[in-house]
A protein has these predicted regions:
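Positively charged n-region of N-terminal signal peptides that target proteins for export
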Residues: 1-7
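Ser/Thr/Pro/Gly-biased, low-complexity, turn-/loop-rich segments
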Residues: 2, 19-244
Length: 244
């Protein structure tokens, strides 16, 4: 019966049932966290009235063990950047340290690559996986900013302007020593990553969504392997970042 199904999913500020299929802690716009129990499938979570009107494009759901792994990888990255900065010294070392400080200030989680939009979850069975174990969900309202990160003179939040392309955001900052100047990486709030051409000879009109991260990475280094895979590591941490 419908009443039985509804009763199986309980929102509370207290403890949750030990018999729950999935237990989820929900963080909403810096409000007190909610505890959800008894969610058998993703649709049981995202269709709750308490979450109506949420901006699902920027929502992040994570699983406990995946979070442990993501946090461990993030610490490895921070250590690598610290070592590389010490080895390089000078302007390059200072620039690397600025990137490390940005990453050190953020928290990462074991983001699950699933669709969270309630309509899409309900319509297709493959979008409605079972929930088993412990999860965390971050969801809120659409932000009015994007974030610049990486080898830029002024990292952090910038006002989002509809129709404004990536190249225009980058024109408002300087790039630090060792920065890639032909491409930048756009990380949309959905977690999708796009390598965007931004030099005068290859630039393309690409508009970020609100809540996006625009990352200016390290240029390729022909004569050393010290930077191999570094941008990929940083982008991985940025895609697993807990929303502000």
């Amino acid at each position: 019966m419908k009443t039985t199904l509804i009763a199986s999913l309980i929102f509370s500020l207290g403890s949750f049932s030990a018999f729950a299929d999935g237990t989820i802690t929900v963080y909403r716009d810096h409000a007190q966290p909610l505890k959800v129990s008894g969610a058998k499938h993703l649709a049981d979570l995202v269709s709750q009235p308490q979450l109506a009107g949420s901006w699902w494009l920027g929502a992040v759901i994570s699983e406990r063990q995946a979070s442990v792994e993501a946090q461990a990888k993030h610490q490895v990255l921070l250590s690598r950047l610290a070592s590389l900065a010490a080895e390089e010294g000078g302007e390059d070392g200072a620039a690397i340290n600025r990137v490390r400080q940005q990453l050190q200030a953020m928290k990462v989680t074991g983001r699950q690559r699933v669709i969270l939009d309630p309509d899409r979850v309900r319509v297709r069975a493959k979008n409605n996986p079972p929930l088993e174990g412990d999860y965390e969900l971050w969801v809120g309202q659409q932000p009015s900013t994007i974030t610049l990160a990486g080898l830029v003179s002024s990292p952090g939040k910038k006002i989002f302007t509809p129709g404004k392309p990536v190249i225009d955001y980058l024109d408002e900052v300087s790039r630090l020593s060792g920065a890639e100047r032909s491409y930048a990486w756009l990380i949309q709030p959905t977690g999708r990553v796009e390598k965007v051409p931004v030099a005068y000879w290859n630039k393309r009109h690409v508009e970020p969504m609100p809540g996006s991260i625009l990352y200016v990475g390290f240029a390729d280094h022909t004569f050393t392997s010290a930077y191999d895979g570094l941008n990929e590591q940083i982008i991985s941490s940025l895609t697993h970042r807990i929303p502000d």
